[in-house]
């Protein structure tokens, strides 16, 4: 048993709410819950299904989605203990400081995952299966393998990050249509430029940890080209979402043009780290505005 584990065994019983939120990566939980809610809300609105008469579905979908995302974050913290201490942004995670032992973190992850999955299956079996697939993709395919072995790790990890809006939709309306497909693609295409911005800022840390992020393996200029490519793909998607009305299409297009302009500016800007910070901030605002707009605009359809 290493020193972290020894310390963890002594202090695990005293971990705080803040330690718990850091263990489950509460920021990621919140953002994924928003996208799951959006998928669910649009399924209600666009299919003429009563929101008020399905309070149980709403509860199980939102809480279940939050729990499986939280479980995935906790699993990831357990898996990454060997590299988290090397990186500045992760060295103070509770699994590194000893506030939560590896065994305790694993137990928390298992409980959250099982309870969350059961709740999703209480909506529709399709939502439950999607939840299981999402956790498997993130924990096994991404965290255990792709993150450490493949330069395409970010793209592979984007599959799991695009699952929550599908869960929300299929919990209400378990059939495919253009809207849930586009929600998946929006989230899938949004993640590479978002996480590549982080990778550029933390390039040296990822290199020290031996993580083959795109900026580490191919360089920053190559990463900028990839980010530009993914933003271009995003600019196409609104034109397949006229079910949400012309106002949404215009708003999404304007947001995409802004992000595209910022992406192009990156090829001329000498300070790549500063530019990456701008890209990161824009990506967060982009997702928030876009998904809130989907909810609000759909009310008036």
UniProtKB/Swiss-Prot annotation:
Gene Ontology terms: cellular component: plasma membrane
Tagged with keyword Transport: no
InterPro entries from the UniProt entry: Protohaem_IX_farnesylTrfase, UbiA_prenyltransferase, UbiA_prenylTrfase_CS, UbiA_sf
Alphabetized UniProt keyword annotations: Cell membrane, Heme biosynthesis, Membrane, Transferase, Transmembrane, Transmembrane helix
Keyword check for Cell membrane: yes
Membrane topology: Multi-pass membrane protein
GO BP annotations, alphabetical order: heme O biosynthetic process
EC number(s) from the headed UniProt entry: 2.5.1.141
One example GO MF annotation: protoheme IX farnesyltransferase activity
Annotated family: Belongs to the UbiA prenyltransferase family. Protoheme IX farnesyltransferase subfamily.
UniProt-listed PANTHER family: PROTOHEME IX FARNESYLTRANSFERASE, MITOCHONDRIAL
Function: Converts heme B (protoheme IX) to heme O by substitution of the vinyl group on carbon 2 of heme B porphyrin ring with a hydroxyethyl farnesyl side group.
Miscellaneous comment text of the record: Carbon 2 of the heme B porphyrin ring is defined according to the Fischer nomenclature.
Name assigned to this protein: Protoheme IX farnesyltransferase
Gene transcribed to yield this protein: ctaB
